[in-house]
């Protein structure tokens, strides 16, 4: 199957551009765009302003929902799970893990040219529209409105790629990025390697690395003299398996309420996830603290560090930790996909001038 055309990133507009923020600015979404804040981040009790995205990214292929006839035409197995809704539309039962996994396989084949994709039972099944949103927004972050930025020359590090390998797959197929994908679970990496081997379009573009230390993030993965334009991460949410199980129960209850159903959902929904994908000691807050601390060790090797932040209350300690480091720019992008709100936290030790030089040296057409 031919590789999808690599997308270029247009100049940022007032609607889509993320905005650099000084750590001393206060949090609240602005009613209208304000000038870019300049200067080096300094210690402060205040937090950067988050720019809110109430819909999917304008370049997101799933902006207008799922075209089920096109999807099951590309991936016939999906048709078994598609059914009409009371609203005259088509959908699947999102409480059925096999239906959700099959939808993902169809989306990856139809939109991204991935002919074979599968995950082990119990592994995290990612919502592709939200995952590719993250990819699009960090592409904007990298380009900073520079039309000459050659996306297919970018090297990207995915921390905790899991068994699904979704960020390397999407980044490779949408922007032509070269990836290093790491994980502490060797079985997860084995599954991603199987996906790569079954899809020639991914071969030679994704390198897998086992993180030998489950308490480290970048140490043990980033090698000496290695350069990355971006790092991505979807951290473990919870601090224990019990907390993760409780979170799953809440999601099940919310799904039942949204469906208006009093019928018990199946015990295993698409809110799956192996232990390392769902929880770690100290939870998301501690994971992010370790990531921020270790990022300083690789300040000159990575242009932008980024991570999803699922819990609003975890932003403040992140801002405080970044304020104590020699961080030049901190950005926060708040994204909304359906009822779910998540955030991309991004920081760079390089000034705007140095980032421009970096792009000219490594990402020029």
Curated annotation (Swiss-Prot):
InterPro entries according to UniProt: METTL16/RlmF, rRNA_lsu_MeTfrase_F, SAM-dependent_MTases_sf
Native species: Shewanella baltica (strain OS155 / ATCC BAA-1091)
Disordered as annotated region, ranges: 1-50
GO cellular component: cytoplasm
Family of the protein in this entry: Belongs to the methyltransferase superfamily. METTL16/RlmF family.
Listed Basic and acidic residues bias regions: 33-50
Localisation per UniProt entry: Cytoplasm
Keyword set, alphabetical order: Cytoplasm, Methyltransferase, rRNA processing, S-adenosyl-L-methionine, Transferase
Positions in coiled-coil regions: none
Matching HAMAP family: 23SrRNA_methyltr_F
PANTHER family cross-referenced by the UniProt entry: RNA N6-ADENOSINE-METHYLTRANSFERASE METTL16 (PTHR13393:SF0), SAM-DEPENDENT METHYLTRANSFERASE (PTHR13393)
Biological processes annotated in GO: rRNA base methylation
Catalytic activity: adenosine(1618) in 23S rRNA + S-adenosyl-L-methionine = N(6)-methyladenosine(1618) in 23S rRNA + S-adenosyl-L-homocysteine + H(+)
Enzyme Commission number(s): 2.1.1.181
The name this protein goes by in its record: Ribosomal RNA large subunit methyltransferase F
Record function comment: Specifically methylates the adenine in position 1618 of 23S rRNA.
Primary localisation category: cytoplasm
């Amino acid at each position: 199957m031919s590789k999808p055309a690599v997308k270029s990133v247009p100049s940022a507009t007032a609607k889509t551009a993320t905005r650099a923020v000084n750590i001393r600015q206060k949090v609240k979404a602005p009613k209208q765009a304000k000038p870019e804040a300049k200067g080096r981040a300094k210690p402060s009790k205040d937090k950067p302003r988050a720019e809110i995205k109430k819909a999917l990214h304008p370049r997101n292929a799933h902006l207008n929902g799922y075209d089920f006839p096109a999807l099951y035409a590309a991936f016939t197995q999906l048709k078994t799970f598609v059914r009409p809704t009371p609203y005259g539309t088509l959908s699947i039962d999102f409480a059925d893990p096999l239906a959700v996994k099959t939808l993902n396989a169809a989306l990856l084949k139809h939109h991204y040219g991935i002919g074979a994709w599968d995950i082990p039972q119990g592994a995290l099944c990612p919502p592709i529209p939200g995952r590719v949103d993250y990819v699009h927004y960090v592409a904007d972050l990298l380009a900073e409105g520079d039309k000459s930025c050659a996306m297919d020359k970018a090297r990207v590090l995915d921390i905790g790629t899991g068994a699904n390998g979704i960020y390397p797959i999407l980044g490779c197929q949408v922007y032509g990025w070269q990836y290093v994908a790491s994980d502490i679970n060797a079985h997860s990496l084995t599954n991603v390697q199987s996906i790569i081997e079954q899809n020639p379009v991914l071969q030679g573009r994704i390198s897998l690395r086992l993180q030998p230390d489950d308490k480290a993030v970048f140490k043990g993965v980033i090698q000496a003299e290695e350069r990355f334009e971006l790092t991505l991460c979807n951290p473990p949410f919870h601090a224990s398996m019990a907390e993760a199980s409780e979170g799953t129960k809440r999601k099940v209850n919310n799904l039942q309420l949204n469906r208006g159903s009093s019928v018990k959902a199946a015990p295993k929904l698409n809110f799956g996830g192996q232990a390392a994908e769902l929880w770690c000691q100290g939870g998301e807050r501690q994971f992010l603290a370790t990531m921020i601390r270790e990022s300083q060790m690789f300040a000159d090797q990575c242009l932008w560090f980024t991570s999803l932040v699922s819990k609003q209350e975890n932003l403040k300690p992140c801002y405080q930790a970044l304020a104590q480091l020699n961080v030049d720019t901190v950005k926060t992008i708040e994204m909304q996909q359906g009822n779910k709100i998540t955030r991309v936290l991004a920081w760079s030790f390089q000034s705007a001038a140095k980032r421009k030089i970096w792009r000219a040296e490594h990402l020029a057409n």
